[in-house]
Amino acid sequence: MGLPPLLSLPSNSAPRSLGRVETPPEVVDFMVSLAEAPRGGRVLEPACAHGPFLRAFREAHGTAYRFVGVEIDPKALDLPPWAEGILADFLLWEPGEAFDLILGNPPYGIVGEASKYPIHVFKAVKDLYKKAFSTWKGKYNLYGAFLEKAVRLLKPGGVLVFVVPATWLVLEDFALLREFLAREGKTSVYYLGEVFPQKKVSAVVIRFQKSGKGLSLWDTQESESGFTPILWAEYPHWEGEIIRFETEETRKLEISGMPLGDLFHIRFAARSPEFKKHPAVRKEPGPGLVPVLTGRNLKPGWVDYEKNHSGLWMPKERAKELRDFYATPHLVVAHTKGTRVVAAWDERAYPWREEFHLLPKEGVRLDPSSLVQWLNSEAMQKHVRTLYRDFVPHLTLRMLERLPVRREYGFHTSPESARNF
């Protein structure tokens, strides 16, 4: 097996800096129950450490397999004698052979500067990763690269079983990964929720087979005996679209209204560095200055214009130099308040450092009060909770675009009408 030059890890590298999180035994057992390989087949655990998945698979399925573990950290590699341990960076490793089964818990986190991201020890090879993986996009999480690499190392018909954060189901950074999985074989997703102790991360198990097509979505029920899978829906023609827990009720609601993205241009606020560079921005209040607002100023149905949470002030009339829509009263929807909808109408047109800003498209006439009331309603919160559960810690652009709005909730369209704020 060919080994690339091994990244020199700092002697004090902590598991967190490598993206490693211990897998609860009940999760390991559930994943092993989904795993399969032909007798005599090759079974691989990436980022293996002491090989919990190899050990559990061998105990459940027997010894008639060739077991291989790959680990980048020499201090962590501790496999039993019946398994072959390889010290290598899995993402750059080229074994020259394919595998029947790959299972495990890949590291997760964004590779970047130590001041911002916990997985900073891989920063030296990040450019190599970006060149190696066709699914790398945006602030790609390391587990996405592990998924692509593992799929490429499978034999035809081979099986992959990983436990990963649920974020890949909906985030735009994983759009290429979802499309890649849809092209390469059959994907099954099992929702577990927050099963990692002391981690605010919602997890799913992905079972991928390098044959067939389509998506199966499963819920699970946990008991003393482990996780029981419950089939939610099957999508035989899945092409990599975002994955949601749709119900008859959510489908009816979406059919009955227009997507918010069809009615509004959705814009992003200027960021802190832009404000700090602007010559009119001050760090102390003064005559003619207003607070630069943040998500903490946005409440369900109203805006707190008085408190300053950003530590920045500026003349309101100059805010349009940062974003032109700051000059116009408009709809503001939270990006930073979890997977729920918090909306208000910014009638004073203040500068904002955060959140989504929605401007009506040509021909859309609005009743701001009714629209805001609908977006903050319990019916809307239930709709979002049902579809997206706790996949991500914030409302995303793609989620926002698809929120349904019926005409009785504050809008109508006509070719002749102009914008009415």
From Swiss-Prot:
The record marks N105, P106, Y108 as: Important for catalytic activity. One of its GO terms (biological process) is DNA restriction-modification system. Disulfide bonds: none annotated. Residues 1-20 are annotated as: Disordered. S-adenosyl-L-methionine binds at T23, E45, P46, A47, C48, E71, D89, P107. Changing F196A: Drastically reduces enzymatic activity; KM for both DNA and s-adenosylmethionine is not significantly changed. Belongs to the N(4)/N(6)-methyltransferase family. This is Type II methyltransferase M.TaqI. The lineage of its organism: Bacteria, Thermotogati, Deinococcota, Deinococci, Thermales. The gene is taqIM.
